[in-house]
């Protein structure tokens, strides 16, 4: 049991200075003043700090991405403390380019491991590839019968994409949609968007030709070039959900793109931010040769949030929505996740006056305290 005293609560909307009592992995009470006399209750002084929902990063290569530069460029698996020190208490894992030396089986095993270590984890079946790599040989069965799997990954308009036809894209989306309905899950298609000239055109075409709801198809990396970004804004205006990626280009940071989106009357609730953490970033020349590559960090999510507040003048409560409540609603786990409310999961961050992460609580357990790692993942300290 944990009692956080005298803390400024952002749910993400500002609630004022409160006391927050946590027990059994849940937020039990949020009141002006809570006093319990019990040695079993851990007291945390929240004076001068902000209490926010834990960040939800819906695009992380938890088993490592990369591989486009041969075997030596396969990125490593992520560790628990890399996520918690970045304020991430819920993560969605997925594969990337490589569905050949990587597998959905390994992805689900890693998801299970991170869950055992204390955070909340979901996953998507598939990779860039088509036919889709799965665990059960069926998109529908993966989503229906594997607890962690809530959707499917596919790539579009990219030189690494499988160049699916509109009919094939329809079938993937239909399978995800129906499986989600049958299992009570989002049943979404996370669509990696590349630099290809077609952009979102295939998506627009299949939505016009079918009854597939817009919410089923979630394009990500849409801030990688101007034309794609404008297409994505139109998509979000029409009711679709779009995901902006941290660290793509200086002039296309998520915060700057959201500023533009709001000026163009794009509904803010249809925009989310993710890190693409532990995926590789790569640069290619005009002939398609790999020139440079590296690995993205999950800490970019927290850094982007800070920049939005400190450099771009977003209010704390507004900047938080793009990494908490908007994401939770899109994943259909709100209000269990993504907010600070009585009855919600106790996934909480304490931020200091500089918005740096002081304390992280995941499912009611203290993972980081006073900027010190309390809980490490298996083998992290070897």
What are these regions (language model features)?
Residues 1-2, 9-52, 373:
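Histidine-rich, glycine-flanked metal-binding segment
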Residues 7, 20, 25, 48, ...:
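Divalent metal-coordination and catalytic microenvironments
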Residues 7-9, 24-27, 339-382:
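C-terminal cap of metal-dependent C-N hydrolases
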Residues 66, 70-73, 78-93, 142-157, ...:
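Active-site gating loops and adjacent loop-to-helix segments of metal-dependent hydrolytic enzymes
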Residues 78-103, 109-131, 146-162, 181-195, ...:
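Divalent metal-dependent hydrolysis catalytic cores, especially in the metallo-beta-lactamase
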Residues 264-349:
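His/Asp/Glu-enriched, well-ordered alpha-helical/loop segment
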